[in-house]
Amino acid sequence: MIMGMSFVSVWVLNQDSAKEFYTKKLGCALTNDLKLDNGMRWLTVRPQGSTGQELLLMDPAHSMLDGPTAEQVRALVAKGALSPGVMATSDCRGDHAALSALGVEFVQEPAVRPYGVEAVIRDDSGNWFSFTQRHG
């Protein structure tokens, strides 16, 4: 029986740069950085203190995708056309200030929504994530 999600794949353009961004700027914990026999790098992070789902930072060129498909994915990532998901926060405005000071690009400033306060960031590859502080 499925019990939940373990990993969510996030396509990145450069795994070294992504590792730096997610650990140094977003403050995620590095959980794995392994070279597999097939040449793929298994690079995972998750929020500090979390024991749940991890982000698998994947380079399309070193995945199970064929060459042309990997190039299409890279182009979509670089264009900022992909949104891997929503990150939860307890203080959207405070995180906005702290992350902005670290050079994280915000494509949407914190704004009140029916479900909470939301801001949107773009990672160093072009992916965008919603940062959401839910009401109550």
Question: Residues of each region from the PLM?
Answer:
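Conserved active-site tyrosine of GNAT-family acetyltransferases
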Residues: 18-23, 99, 126
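Short Gly/charged-rich anion-binding patches and loops
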Residues: 17-18, 94
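Vicinal oxygen chelate
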Residues: 1-7, 29-88, 93-124, 132-136
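Short acidic-aromatic low-complexity motifs
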Residues: 12-16
